[in-house]
């Protein structure tokens, strides 16, 4: 699968632009703020129905305009190509179409054109709270299992209802134990399904991660990745039962898979967040995302798109070259990369003997360099 063509109308800082891509590696080069990352975000829209950076769709309409449209032509086989479009008018619902037909639900599109994106913002997976790491797990599983996304939505809805019930009980000083048991039963059923899928996913995912990190670092340091969940140590039903008084006092659900986390460590168990250098943290993140790529490829049977935004920052030349050698291998599919230095990216690919198509980006316009 690869993206053959991308067209933008009134999207972010682009008025109108159409680009024809290589099925191998494509680079967007130019100064910061020119619009390189906006092109990656447009591709992300076509894959996942939303921006990678900003969930408010209306803020992606070009200043002074009333709407935007992003269109792409995906080629899955030599004989099969799909036209995907996303459009939005101010104060109206977002429209998402495949071959000019609307999707009944946006969730039906997720996973059809899988994508992995690596950006400087991803450092939040390491430095921020557990919610960011759960989002990472859920994003990966959702692109390979549509039912997982539905189950996750259902779980979040029940948690919200249970928390509202606990708040009402605190206000009235009356607790309906029968209704609480219904919420608990629903939560246990759905939560156990999510826990089982997350646990199975991590067992498959971890070997991919280790392989990629060892390659990038050339076995320079030992890192570990562990899945943490309250359900690893007790049943969900028992956790809810034993924490009932605590939940009443807090007026929220204190235990469950919404407390799951990933533990990242380096140097035999030291927290990566505190003891990893910026280069080691970036190598860890890239290995995570490349493991996501390998997981998608195994599950889907074809290569997803790989988007690399400003990945050279904070990496030494050796690790940079190893990453580019890896992703430009025939085992990988189509790649999009941004860099402020056209000569640098051109030289890297010349050194490893791989073709690359370079687009010069200036003030919301992108043109192929000949």
Residue map of PLM features:
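Walker B catalytic acidic pair
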Residues: 309-311
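Structural recognition of the conserved hydrophobic beta-strand(s) that form the central parallel beta-sheet
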Residues: 72, 334-341
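Nucleotide-state sensing region of NTPase/ATPase domains
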Residues: 48-126, 130-132, 141-144, 148, ...
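Conserved lysine of the Walker
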Residues: 36
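Post-Walker A helix-loop "phosphate-sensing" segment adjacent to the P-loop in P-loop NTPases
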Residues: 45-57, 291-299
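Conserved NTPase motor "head" modules and their coupling/switch loops across ABC/AAA+ ATPases, GTPases
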Residues: 1-31, 174-305, 314, 318, ...
């Amino acid at each position: 699968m690869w993206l053959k063509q991308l067209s933008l109308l009134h999207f972010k800082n682009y008025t109108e632009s159409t680009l024809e891509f290589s099925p191998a590696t494509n680079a967007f080069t130019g100064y910061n703020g020119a619009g390189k990352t906006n092109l990656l975000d447009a591709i992300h829209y076509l894959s996942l129905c939303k921006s990678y950076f900003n969930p408010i769709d209306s803020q992606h309409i070009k200043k002074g305009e009333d709407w935007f449209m992003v269109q792409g032509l995906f080629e899955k086989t030599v004989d099969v190509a799909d036209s995907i479009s996303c459009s939005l008018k101010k104060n109206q619902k977002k429209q998402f179409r495949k071959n000019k037909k609307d999707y009944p639900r946006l969730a039906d599109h997720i996973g059809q054109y899988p994508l992995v994106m690596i950006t400087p913002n991803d450092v939040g997976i390491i430095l921020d709270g557990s919610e960011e790491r759960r989002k990472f797990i859920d994003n990966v599983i959702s692109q390979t299992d549509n039912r997982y996304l539905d189950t996750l939505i259902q779980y979040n809805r029940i948690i919200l209802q249970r928390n509202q019930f606990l708040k009402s009980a605190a206000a009235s000083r009356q607790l309906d134990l029968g209704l609480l048991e219904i919420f608990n039963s629903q939560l246990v059923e759905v939560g156990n399904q999510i826990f089982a899928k997350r646990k199975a996913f991590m067992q498959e995912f971890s070997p991919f991660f280790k392989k990629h990190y060892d390659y990038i670092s050339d076995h320079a340091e030992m890192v570990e990745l562990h899945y943490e969940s309250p359900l690893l140590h007790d049943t969900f039903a028992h956790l809810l039962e034993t924490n009932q008084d605590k939940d009443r006092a807090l007026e929220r659900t204190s235990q469950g898979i919404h407390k799951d986390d990933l533990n990242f460590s380096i140097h035999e168990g030291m927290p990566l967040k505190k003891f990893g250098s910026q280069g080691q943290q970036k190598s860890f993140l890239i290995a995570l995302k490349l493991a996501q790529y390998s997981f998608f490829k195994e599950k889907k049977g074809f290569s997803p798109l790989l988007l690399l935004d400003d990945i050279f920052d904070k990496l030494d030349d050796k690790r940079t070259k190893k990453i580019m050698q890896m992703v430009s291998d025939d085992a990988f599919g189509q790649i999009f990369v941004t860099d402020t230095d056209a000569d640098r990216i051109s030289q890297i690919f010349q050194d490893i003997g791989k073709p690359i198509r370079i687009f010069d980006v200036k003030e919301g316009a992108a043109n192929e360099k000949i």
